[in-house]
């Protein structure tokens, strides 16, 4: 009986080990397949971008800026985004603006960033609105203006950016419009994460102070 038990245990251990090995092999294959797809996408975008395709240049710049399907490379992000921006891509204008705004691969230049974000907005890129709002709220490269910040945040809020919504709520809170601030803080889209945590905290503070 003891001998049979030992044999069964050995079989189970062997099966478990084989299962783990198979899973590791599958994970490696899956990772390799994903990497191949990512490499192929970047390769295809690069080929199109070199031929002057504006959309490909824009996407390639974004890929290098945010590390999408490739490693972050701010030099290449700037190179391809500038090419696309020169051809009128509003998204690319915003992306070049982000590089200057954050100082990614270049020296921070708020005036240059402001111009690029403004051009991006004029071209219809909604993402640039958030940055313009931030610049006016904090007085980065422009004279601080909560009215102007609220103006841009209001427009950007329609895109569903919860960070923008929180920033807008803080401006209303500072202005004493607690009802509007509460309304904005409550719009968390049902999320409970690091992005919405400041909204819940601000909401709790207002309720605790009897300003809800």
How would you label these PLM feature ranges?
Residues 15-17:
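C-terminal motif of bacterial Sec signal peptides marking the signal peptidase cleavage site
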Residues 19-21:
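Bacterial signal peptide processing site
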Residues 50-53, 66-68, 86-89, 102-104, ...:
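Short helix-capping/linker turns of helical repeat alpha-solenoids
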Residues 59-66, 70, 93-102, 116, ...:
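Hydrophobic face of amphipathic alpha-helices that form TPR/SEL1-like repeat modules
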């Amino acid at each position: 009986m003891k001998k049979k038990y030992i044999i069964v245990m050995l079989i189970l251990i062997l099966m478990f080990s084989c299962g783990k090995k198979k899973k590791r092999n599958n994970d490696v294959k899956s990772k390799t397949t994903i990497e191949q797809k990512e490499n192929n996408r970047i390769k295809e975008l690069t080929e199109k971008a070199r031929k002057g395709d504006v959309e490909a240049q824009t996407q390639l710049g974004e890929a290098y800026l945010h590390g999408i399907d490739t490693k972050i490379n701010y030099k290449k992000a700037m190179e391809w985004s500038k090419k696309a921006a020169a051809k009128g891509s509003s998204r690319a204008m915003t992306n070049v603006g982000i590089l200057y705004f954050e100082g990614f691969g270049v020296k921070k230049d708020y005036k240059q960033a402001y111009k690029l974000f403004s051009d991006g907005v004029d071209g219809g890129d909604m993402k640039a609105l958030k940055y313009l709002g931030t610049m006016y709220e904090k007085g980065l490269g422009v004279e601080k203006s909560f009215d102007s910040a609220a103006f841009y945040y209001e427009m950007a809020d329609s895109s569903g950016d919860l960070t923008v919504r929180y920033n807008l709520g803080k401006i209303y809170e500072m202005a004493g419009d607690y009802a509007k601030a509460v309304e904005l803080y409550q719009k968390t889209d049902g999320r409970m994460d690091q992005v919405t945590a400041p909204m819940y905290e601000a909401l709790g503070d207002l309720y605790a102070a009897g300003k809800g």
